[in-house]
């Protein structure tokens, strides 16, 4: 719980700075934070180094400086990451990245979701389905596609805290309940 509060607070702070600097800064900082999060996920040793209380702040800053140099981070991002090091908050970097991504999506009007189907869809069908869903919802969608043979047919769309279940499994479940009640 406290992890979430800390991560959200720092994500809000760097996002507010990005808003002042313009849309390009918002996007580039989002990309930088996402790349940092991916680097930490891909290299557990790096993640452990930045989280370790045994390693000094200056050593952590040196590692961050090299990493941020490779990512071509602007001075504000560098200062932000160094502040996290000074405040012993580098352990929250991945969570900060995730929260920043949510804030950025919200600012751009993008809704992320998952579309589950019973069979694998072609790229053309995915594009048409995405376009149709965007028209119906009135928002820009970023969808990930998954296959679950257990739904038998149809689809299940998960967007945020909403679930639209248009699967054959759900329809059969409704039919079963109707028969049980004797309607």
From Swiss-Prot:
F-type ATPases have 2 components, F(1) - the catalytic core - and F(0) - the membrane proton channel. F(1) has five subunits: alpha(3), beta(3), gamma(1), delta(1), epsilon(1). F(0) has three main subunits: a(1), b(2) and c(10-14). The alpha and beta chains form an alternating ring which encloses part of the gamma chain. F(1) is attached to F(0) by a central stalk formed by the gamma and epsilon chains, while a peripheral stalk is formed by the delta and b chains. The gene is atpH. It is a peripheral membrane protein. Belongs to the ATPase delta chain family. Pfam families: OSCP (PF00213). This is ATP synthase subunit delta. One of its GO terms (molecular function) is proton-transporting ATP synthase activity, rotational mechanism. GO terms for cellular component: plasma membrane; proton-transporting ATP synthase complex. It comes from Desulfovibrio desulfuricans (strain ATCC 27774 / DSM 6949 / MB). F(1)F(0) ATP synthase produces ATP from ADP in the presence of a proton or sodium gradient. F-type ATPases consist of two structural domains, F(1) containing the extramembraneous catalytic core and F(0) containing the membrane proton channel, linked together by a central stalk and a peripheral stalk. During catalysis, ATP synthesis in the catalytic domain of F(1) is coupled via a rotary mechanism of the central stalk subunits to proton translocation. InterPro entries: ATP_synth_OSCP/delta_N_sf, ATPase_OSCP/d_CS, ATPase_OSCP/dsu. It is found in: Cell inner membrane.
């Amino acid at each position: 719980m406290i992890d979430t509060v800390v991560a959200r607070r720092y994500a809000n702070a760097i996002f507010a700075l990005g808003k002042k600097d313009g849309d390009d800064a918002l996007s580039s900082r989002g990309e930088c934070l996402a790349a940092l999060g991916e680097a930490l996920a891909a290299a557990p040793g790096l993640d452990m180094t930045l989280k370790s209380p045994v390693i000094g702040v200056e050593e952590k800053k040196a590692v961050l400086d090299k990493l941020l140099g490779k990512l071509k981070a602007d001075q504000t991002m560098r200062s932000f990451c160094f502040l996290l090091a000074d405040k012993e908050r580098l352990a929250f970097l991945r969570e900060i990245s995730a929260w920043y991504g949510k804030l950025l999506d919200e600012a751009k009007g993008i809704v992320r979701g998952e579309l589950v189907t019973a069979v694998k869809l072609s790229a053309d069908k995915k594009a048409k389905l995405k376009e149709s869903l965007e028209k119906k919802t009135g928002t820009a969608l970023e969808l990930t596609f998954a296959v679950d043979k257990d739904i038998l047919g149809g689809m299940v769309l998960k967007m945020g805290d909403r679930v639209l279940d248009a699967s054959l499994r759900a329809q059969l479940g409704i039919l079963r309940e109707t028969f049980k009640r004797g309607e």
